[in-house]
Amino acid sequence: MSSPTSTPSRRRNKRGRGSNPPTPHGEEVQSPPSQRRRTEDSTSIGELLPMPTSPSGDVQSPSGQELLFSSPAPSRHSAHQSELDLSSPLTYGTPSSRVEGTPRSGIRGTPARQRPDLGSARKVKQVDLHSDQPAAEELVTSEQSLGQKLVIWGTDVNVATCKEKFQRFVQRFIDPSAKEEDNVGLDLNEPIYMQRLEEINVVGDPFLNIDCDHLRNFDQDLYRQLVCYPQEVIPTFDMAANEIFFERYPDSILEHQIQVRPYNALKTRNMRSLNPEDIDQLITISGMVIRTSQIIPEMQEAFFKCQVCAFTTRVEIDRGRIAEPSVCKHCNTTHSMALIHNRSMFSDKQMIKLQESPEDMPAGQTPHTTILYGHNDLVDKVQPGDRVNVTGIYRAVPIRVNPRVRNVKSVYKTHIDVIHYRKTDSKRLHGIDEDTEQKLFTEERVAMLKELAAKPDIYERLAAALAPSIYEHEDIKKGILLQLFGGTRKDFSHTGRGKFRAEVNILLCGDPGTSKSQLLQYVFNLVPRGQYTSGKGSSAVGLTAYVMKDPETRQLVLQTGALVLSDNGICCIDEFDKMNESTRSVLHEVMEQQTLSIAKAGIICQLNARTSVLAAANPVESQWNPKKTTIENIQLPHTLLSRFDLIFLMLDPQDEAYDRRLAHHLVALYYQSEEQMKEEHLDMAVLKDYIAYARTYVNPRLSEEASQALIEAYVSMRKIGSGRGMVSAYPRQLESLIRLSEAHAKVRFSNKVETIDVEEAKRLHREALKQSATDPRTGIVDISILTTGMSATARKRKEELAQVLKKLIQSKGKTPALKYQQLFEDLRGQSDAAITKDMFDEALHALADDDYLTVTGKTVRLL
């Protein structure tokens, strides 16, 4: 590290190479005498920005070598602040950007990285508290007195006082209402944020998240200033946090200076209630991310070079505008400055579209959306489908009349510069496969969950805790519980065997009013990445993806649908039978391959859709007809039904004893107290933690005994139908048994699938087949109803009828043409069983397929 006693001329030349950012109003900060004299003596281009709010000076090291952003040795503590530039809140930048080992470092062409989420760096005029005029030089005797007398123009923020208050908050605040599960690994009797700084020193992640609720409880005036003037106050917080950190850990090395990120602002606004009074204030809104753009490079500092004399200068961006130098300050040539892109400094930027959460929407309204801009480290932190609480600064920018003309309209468009994301939803399960959402469990919580898993009746207790307001349907609840746990995801693509899905698909079908939609709503409100849609109100592109023109870039972009948004979650589809054919056809690939192939408008890609499908369907005749098969009742293609692991019937039994028990249960929901309800069922928070822990940390594998049991189960299922000449099981049924067995092992927190898991999977699968794949004429389970759409007995009857019809035609002699109606009546007359017109048509088509006859209009012609 260079010595602070280097010659002033070298220091001035180093600093003078860049030009200062323009002020919004054209004013400059009043300098203290020591710095003003240094500025007057300077012969370099530009001016030295004063630092009235902090003893640290904005003075760069004169060394030609770059420096690491670390604290100096303890013996040189006096030089610490002048060398490191812990960032002025008025000319805000990160000192580490000119150092080695940090992004975009090395060449002077990559200067100080500012925080784009707070807006660009700018000079801020300070005024005397007791005067309308700017502070005069003769009134200022020292930097300390300046900090005590002045506030930032347009605000009531005194930087020295603000910094002192925040340092006191960080060093002293202890949250009396803190919960251990929310502060894992922290001592709740010690200052919370000092422990957070210690974490930064250990981990090296230079971000300090501040709960605004803590700040409000500690100092309401400081909290008010933060909400009203975030662009001025947050840099002051940054400076205070860095001073505390490097005084405590002088040898620490960070990527860049610590950035304070406040969240949980009390000024939490509904997206609809944002109005002009919130502009440039700190707000918190919640919603669901529906689209994220690609990473956009945004210029932070422009590098200009004179084409005549090769003089260079830098211009910092102010609110998205570049003040291009019109005259070269060295040779006074006009319009000779050219922008050098590879010497300019850029930052990462991403546009995120946030949609209003369904629970925040008023009745009968369409959801509102707003645009977010994430910068640098906040890029790619959220994905479409995430539910987030966003803390940021509400901005308004004018709209240009024409992109090529600088004239602007009087109408402004708004966006939010993101400062903090918080992906938490207390009502839902904790997410999986996402580092930011993985639930951290305390040792006590894990011990309690493992103790719960050791109980022999844990499977029944968890199933009873699922939708306790819905009466009975125990097997259906157990099936949905296994769907929530899911199987083990296996990838054998390196051996050429491909990937095997772990998601369980379930279809509920039956009479109206049997709580099918209630179960779907319960699951939707429980899972983190769930989507709820209705079959009648969904289109094929709404479920998959569609191409639209980006309003910002005017380019064609892919907008994802419900199935892609519910990746790693559950997609609940109600009114499944009312979906049109084109919409249902897109589900075939999703439910088996777990991917979605798109080829639209020149965009060809394959999206992940690793989602479980929970669907509900009503019968065509509004009431289940026991004389018809499942296919005939709900009119769904057998190719789609065969992809469901479990198909349950929810029928109204029309039994007086059942009706009495159901009525007693419904009435009890109204008169029982909450304490009684809690005693009967498992706590909802425990259920969510239990499922989240199992999905994250338990990955069961098949044992030798379980493998043999699965083989025997599959072979026995095949044997059932072999004697009658029909197929009663397919490989898909075996894969379903494996997934259900793995899910049941997860319920027990077991990393090995045992025989008891296979037995329960067999029982549940058999119960579902008894309901959905039973031939109504014979009462025998026939899996071919779901796989081919026709039972074996129906197929046999069709063949027999075709043979009878063939004999009837042969008995009529060599007649080339027969009347359709006459032939039908003759067949009905000689048959003992009732023959419908549909059966007659099927027999004719069977003979036509054998090239025996052809049907033309109302005439049957022999071939």
Curated annotation (Swiss-Prot):
What this protein catalyses is: ATP + H2O = ADP + phosphate + H(+)
Could you provide one GO biological process annotation from this protein's UniProt record?
mitotic DNA replication initiation
Q: Which GO terms describe its cellular component?
A: chromatin; CMG complex; MCM complex; nucleus
User: Is Lipoprotein one of the keywords?
Assistant: no
Subcellular localization, as worded in the UniProt entry: Nucleus; Chromosome
Sorted alphabetically, which Gene3D superfamilies does this protein's record hold?
Answer: 2.20.28.10, mini-chromosome maintenance (MCM) complex, chain A, domain 1, Nucleic acid-binding proteins, P-loop containing nucleotide triphosphate hydrolases
Keywords of this entry: ATP-binding, Cell cycle, Chromosome, DNA replication, DNA-binding, Helicase, Hydrolase, Metal-binding, Nucleotide-binding, Nucleus, Zinc, Zinc-finger
Signal sequence extent: none
Q: Does the keyword Iron apply?
A: no
Give the enzyme's main class according to its UniProt record, as a single word. hydrolase
What SMART domains does the record point to? MCM
Q: What is its EC number?
A: 3.6.4.12
Pfam families given for it?
A: MCM, MCM4_WHD, MCM_lid, MCM_N, MCM_OB
List residue spans of C4-type Zn fingers. 306-331
Specify which residues bind ATP 1 according to the UniProt entry for this protein.
Answer: 497, 643, 732, 735
Which intervals of this chain are the motif Arginine finger?
A: 642-645
User: Which residues does the annotated region (Disordered) include?
Assistant: 1-130
Q: Which residues form the MCM domain?
A: 458-667
A Gene Ontology molecular function term of the record: single-stranded DNA helicase activity
Q: Where does ATP 2 bind?
A: 471, 516-517, 618
What modifications does the entry list under PTM / processing? Hyperphosphorylated during mitosis in a mechanism requiring cdc2-cyclin B and other kinases. Undergoes dephosphorylation after exiting mitosis, existing in a partially phosphorylated state in the cytosolic interphase mcm complex which associates with the pre-replication complexes (pre-Rcs). Complete dephosphorylation inactivates the mcm complex, preventing its binding to chromatin. Becomes actively phosphorylated during S phase once the mcm complex is assembled on the chromatin. This chromatin-associated phosphorylation occurs during the activation of the pre-Rcs and is independent of cdks.
Family recorded in the similarity comment? Belongs to the MCM family.
Task: State the remark under miscellaneous.
Answer: Early fractionation of eukaryotic MCM proteins yielded a variety of dimeric, trimeric and tetrameric complexes with unclear biological significance. Specifically a MCM467 subcomplex is shown to have in vitro helicase activity which is inhibited by the MCM2 subunit. The MCM2-7 hexamer is the proposed physiological active complex.
Outline what the protein does: Acts as a component of the MCM2-7 complex (MCM complex) which is the replicative helicase essential for 'once per cell cycle' DNA replication initiation and elongation in eukaryotic cells. Core component of CDC45-MCM-GINS (CMG) helicase, the molecular machine that unwinds template DNA during replication, and around which the replisome is built.
Quaternary structure, from the entry: Component of the mcm2-7 complex (RLF-M). The complex forms a toroidal hexameric ring with the proposed subunit order mcm2-mcm6-mcm4-mcm7-mcm3-mcm5. The heterodimer of mmcm3/mcm5 interacts with mcm4, mmcm6, mcm7 and weakly with mcm2. Begins to associate with zmcm6 at the neurula stage. Component of the CMG helicase complex, composed of the mcm2-7 complex, the GINS complex and cdc45.
Q: What is this protein called?
A: DNA replication licensing factor mcm4-B
Gene assigned in the entry: mcm4-b
